[in-house]
Amino acid sequence: MTLNTEQEAKTPLHRRASTPLPLSPRGHQPGRLSTVPSTQSQHPRLGQSASLNPPTQKPSPAPDDWSSESSDSEGSWEALYRVVLLGDPGVGKTSLASLFAGKQERDLHEQLGEDVYERTLTVDGEDTTLVVVDTWEAEKLDKSWSQESCLQGGSAYVIVYSIADRGSFESASELRIQLRRTHQADHVPIILVGNKADLARCREVSVEEGRACAVVFDCKFIETSATLQHNVAELFEGVVRQLRLRRRDSAAKEPPAPRRPASLAQRARRFLARLTARSARRRALKARSKSCHNLAVL
């Protein structure tokens, strides 16, 4: 029996259908399968489509973030400020807010909420919109985080006490300390208001005490009477002027240059200057006590 080895060597081998084809390390060829992925992807991966993941956009500022310190000074909210009324119950905060709202002039004010009022005032020929918030008592009774946000979300603060209630005056001093802790680096105007000046016979807090408190805590001072509508307009016009002055003052300030270490001679001069500065401090304190009731100056 003769084996045709030469004929078998020339003819290609026939494989069964179940026999796998050899893997090719090269690219795709007709009739063969390739397990090597293509270097150029024809379609983006799932979850990476540009239509499914649009570029992120910054959220629009909330109304609570409206402030005179906004970087967009040319925006439509430049002259809108949030004024927060603080103080014990019964000192006249709601009466002052109602007079600000001008209930006799419905076309000049808009009530945004139960205790929130908005009104545009023309002071020194320039329009400024104030949003007066009288929600301190509701937030205090609620004992929630909103009371803390009330101390942080104002463009200006009006601390009200009654001249016929020394306890409310002491509470006003405590509120001023809380505001100082909350706004340590902020240039926020704070006005101390002695309301119910019409109750002169029941007075427990003198004008001198109110001024001294304003000087110590670096704020403005004014006495009002919501019953007689005395100094109420001057109060809110003063708030507008203080906001403008603080805004201009903070804009004019430049970051300080880095200080060099002082020499021995410079330190000696500073020490001698401190020894002789007591009279100057007294004069400055006296000047501040004279100007603390002037809401048209810093």
Curated annotation (Swiss-Prot):
Stretches for region Calmodulin-binding: 268-287
PROSITE patterns: RAS
One example of a Gene Ontology biological process annotation: regulation of skeletal muscle contraction by calcium ion signaling
SUPFAM superfamilies: P-loop containing nucleoside triphosphate hydrolases
Domain of life of the native organism: Eukaryota
Residue ranges, compositional bias (Low complexity): 63-73
Keyword terms: Calmodulin-binding, GTP-binding, Nucleotide-binding, Phosphoprotein
Binding of GTP, residues: 87-94, 195-198
Tissue localization of expression: Most highly expressed in the endothelial lining of the blood vessels in uterus and heart. Lower levels found in spleen, lymph node, kidney and testis. Also found in cells with secretory function such as the islets of Langerhans, lobule/duct epithelium in the breast, bile duct epithelium in the liver, surface epithelium in the endometrial glands of the uterus, colon mucosa and acinar cells in the pancreas and the prostate.
Polar residues: bias regions: 35-55
Signal peptide start and end residues: none
Positions of post-translational Phosphoserine modification: 51
Region annotation Disordered: where it falls in the sequence: 1-73
Record-given protein name: GTP-binding protein REM 1
Organism (species): Homo sapiens (Human)
